[in-house]
Amino acid sequence: MIPVTEFRQFSEQQPAFRVLKPWWDVFTDYLSVAMLMIGVFGCTLQVMQDKIICLPKRVQPAQNHSSLSNVSQTVINTTPLPPPKPSPTNPATVEMKGLKTDLDLQQYSFINQMCYERALHWYAKYFPYLVLIHTLVFMLCSNFWFKFPGSSSKIEHFISILGKCFDSPWTTRALSEVSGEDSEEKDNRKNNMNRSNTIQSGPEGSLVKSQSLKSIPEKFVVDKSTAGALDKKEGEQAKALFEKVKKFRLHVEEGDILYAMYVRQTVLKVIKFLIIIAYNSALVSKVQFTVDCNVDIQDMTGYKNFSCNHTMAHLFSKLSFCYLCFVSIYGLTCLYTLYWLFYRSLREYSFEYVRQETGIDDIPDVKNDFAFMLHMIDQYDPLYSKRFAVFLSEVSENKLKQLNLNNEWTPDKLRQKLQTNAHNRLELPLIMLSGLPDTVFEITELQSLKLEIIKNVMIPATIAQLDNLQELSLHQCSVKIHSAALSFLKENLKVLSVKFDDMRELPPWMYGLRNLEELYLVGSLSHDISKNVTLESLRDLKSLKILSIKSNVSKIPQAVVDVSSHLQKMCIHNDGTKLVMLNNLKKMTNLTELELVHCDLERIPHAVFSLLSLQELDLKENNLKSIEEIVSFQHLRKLTVLKLWYNSIAYIPEHIKKLTSLERLFFSHNKVEVLPSHLFLCNKIRYLDLSYNDIRFIPPEIGVLQSLQYFSITCNKVESLPDELYFCKKLKTLKIGKNSLSVLSPKIGNLLFLSYLDIKGNHFEVLPPELGDCRALKRAGLVVEDALFETLPSDVREQMKAD
């Protein structure tokens, strides 16, 4: 016989595919095996046994009905006539007599073959082969989607990920956290779920899509001691699983090839079932035990009419009825499958019950082939979907990232990154991490925390452990904060720096930091809430003293006006956007420092002259060409620092002499050609920067500046320095590089406090040895060509090189 196992290749699939075989597919597989056995058994009998046995019919005209009946019975049954009674004279001898046909074995074989081909109905001949073929087609249809490249690749990928998610220690840990919930909460959740199920009746809603999930037990009995332990390797594996699930979901949700293929193969099986039932029911009666055969072979055998016996007719008849029963059950199962496919919304899958039972509220619903495979999984075991859902949750992913972060960033490793920032605070910078490690809050000596390009940061209540924390920097970070952490920051935070690209990166909780003293904002702001980020009122920042905004505003935001009464320093860096409305400046009566940088200003704003408390004004990188309004600065008695650098100012008006309180003046990177002697009537100037202009002459009145400590005319066109410059005995820094100087006066030795001298880029041929009298000047503070330095006496050179 042919073993059934030879046909397993038609239905063979990977053992892991069983999770995508619902009960009806398993049931039809068993039915297919039964039908396959019928076909194989019938084919084996057909091959190994005689198909038909025929005897010739002899027509005798003069016989009564009795004798004809005897002859017919003899021919049909191929049994000899009863022997004649033995002669009494010879009782020991018995002679067997019957109807002689005068046919040999070859002729009988020929007759059997001819009658099998001509007289026997085709259904009786090919019944076992038809059963075998139909069954193999059923098997191919049932398993085609497991073999087709376009679908099998998705299925294999899905099952691979599913198995890893099911066995992942992170899944056990995530679900074990749910099992520890308060029993009252779980009872309330269950009651709410039952009520929602009662209300939702009639057509299936979104919850009914995953109705099989209701059979999942609400609690998992997990040993928390084992569930809580997750080493670094397991954490990395779980992290990789999250990425795989994300990519797989994006790939599979794009199409519905799996659903379409499963529907088509089911429809094909139903059509085939109807065809089989139709023609088998009509032809099963053609399987007869006795067959009359009329073939024209009289010239070869001497007979034309034959009576044949289909030896397997009785068995085939029973097998055909049995086969029809199996096919009927198979077909009804396929009809139920079609009902399930079209009645249920299988292109959408809701995790509503999983969200309710696990408390993980952000598990998304899925669609298309992803949803269909999950529906199929639920028919196998709903627990697979529940454990798989853990890897669809961003909350779960964030918890895992947090755990991995804590394992990677230990307190000792974080302490190695500590540094002192510009505010002389001990700062910890963290850049481009997946989150904020909990171990940060174990570094109690931390004074400043700087976070850059970190998404979904959650500041926990444990930040209260950082007793010394005063400064927080958030650069392109979306931050959420625990209520207890917010209370801590309200009391302790002094400095907040925020760099943002969109509204999500501008923390809404910053408006309530009542003890905040310094606020630095960098990002695009707009007065139109529909276009960009808007700044809300800062009125609750009662302690705010310094406000810096680097943005593109066209006027001073109203939020700034809300803190004008106590604001002491305001900086606006406008990135070239023209600042046109400055009337709100008049309300900032306590302002001591004002920076309007890169605001495309063409004139000094008149509102500035109302700031009687102003001490420092910076108008860097504007479009100032004339500063005639500088005369109004005489009313600003406290103004000590004026920065007009990086503009297009061509001359300095004589009115500058009225700024008698001026101590620091920045005029670099302009187009000044002539220095007015009246400038040096501001005799309190300690810092004077005139570098990068077109100045050719330094007035001798510079000697009046007896408080001058810093003087720079780098990159001008000065050809000589007045001797009066060396009367400025307090001068510490002198920058005269990149000019047209040819001689350095020996009087430079009068500058006893000189510690920095830049003379590089001139036409000097020799340096005066009097430089040795500048005891504070060392080689590191002398910027000069090496060849020119060698012109100094050796003792002077050694003196400068000495520490």
From Swiss-Prot:
Extracellular topology ranges: 44-125, 288-320
One GO molecular function term? volume-sensitive anion channel activity
Quote the InterPro entries the UniProt record gives.
Leu-rich_rpt, Leu-rich_rpt_typical-subtyp, LRR_dom_sf, LRR_domain-containing, LRRC8_Pannexin-like
- From the record, give the transmembrane residue ranges: 23-43, 126-146, 267-287, 321-341
- Report which reactions are catalysed by this protein: chloride(in) = chloride(out); iodide(out) = iodide(in); taurine(out) = taurine(in); 2',3'-cGAMP(out) = 2',3'-cGAMP(in)
Q: Which UniProt keywords apply?
A: Cell membrane, Disulfide bond, Endoplasmic reticulum, Glycoprotein, Ion channel, Ion transport, Leucine-rich repeat, Membrane, Phosphoprotein, Repeat, Transmembrane, Transmembrane helix, Transport
Q: Which residues lie on this side of the membrane: Cytoplasmic?
A: 1-22, 147-266, 342-803
What subcellular compartments does it reside in? Answer: Cell membrane; Endoplasmic reticulum membrane
Keyword Coiled coil found: no
Q: Does the keyword Phosphoprotein apply?
A: yes
What are the GO cellular component annotations? cytoplasm; endoplasmic reticulum; endoplasmic reticulum membrane; monoatomic ion channel complex; plasma membrane
Q: Which family does it belong to?
A: Belongs to the LRRC8 family.
Assembly with partners or alone: Heterohexamer; oligomerizes with other LRRC8 proteins (LRRC8A, LRRC8B, LRRC8D and/or LRRC8E) to form a heterohexamer. Homoheptamer; inactive, likely because it is not targeted to the plasma membrane in the absence of LRRC8A. In vivo, the subunit composition may depend primarily on expression levels, and heterooligomeric channels containing various proportions of the different LRRC8 proteins may coexist.
Q: What is known of its domains?
A: The volume-regulated anion channel (VRAC) channel forms a trimer of dimers, with symmetry mismatch between the pore-forming domain and the cytosolic LRR repeats, a topology similar to gap junction proteins.
Q: What does this protein do?
A: Non-essential component of the volume-regulated anion channel (VRAC, also named VSOAC channel), an anion channel required to maintain a constant cell volume in response to extracellular or intracellular osmotic changes. The VRAC channel conducts iodide better than chloride and can also conduct organic osmolytes like taurine. Plays a redundant role in the efflux of amino acids, such as aspartate and glutamate, in response to osmotic stress.
* Name under which the protein is recorded: Volume-regulated anion channel subunit LRRC8C
Q: Which organism is it from?
A: Rattus norvegicus (Rat)
The root-end lineage is: Eukaryota, Metazoa, Chordata, Craniata, Vertebrata
